[in-house]
Amino acid sequence: MKAVLVQMLKGYKRWISPLLPVSCRYVPTCSEYAMEAISIHGAVRGSVLALGRLLRCHPFVRGGYDPVPRSHSCCDDKISTTAHDAVR
C-alpha cells in the first residue's frame, strides 16, 4: 500500500503538478511532504500527516519550513528525554 501511494504521488509530481501554478507555501512541498511522511510513518499515519499538511496549506498562512515529524509515537520524546537525563 505504501509503495502504491508513493508511486501515485510521483505520478502527480511528474504529470499533473507541472500543469498547475506553483502554490505550495511550504518547504518541502506538500507532495514531497506526503511522500516522505508515507515512507517514514507508513500508509495510514503518513496519509493522516499529509492530509493535515494539505489543510494547513492555504493563502492565509505564511508557510515556510515544515518538516515531517520523525517521532513514531507520542511517547518517543519522553523516552529520549529520560534517557538523556539519565546520562547526565
UniProtKB/Swiss-Prot annotation:
Keywords of this entry: Cell inner membrane, Cell membrane, Membrane
Lipid bilayer topology: Peripheral membrane protein
GO cellular component: plasma membrane
Compartment annotation: Cell inner membrane
Keyword Cell inner membrane assigned: yes
Annotated function: Could be involved in insertion of integral membrane proteins into the membrane.
Family membership: Belongs to the UPF0161 family.
PANTHER family with a match to the protein in the record: MEMBRANE PROTEIN INSERTION EFFICIENCY FACTOR-RELATED
Record-given protein name: Putative membrane protein insertion efficiency factor
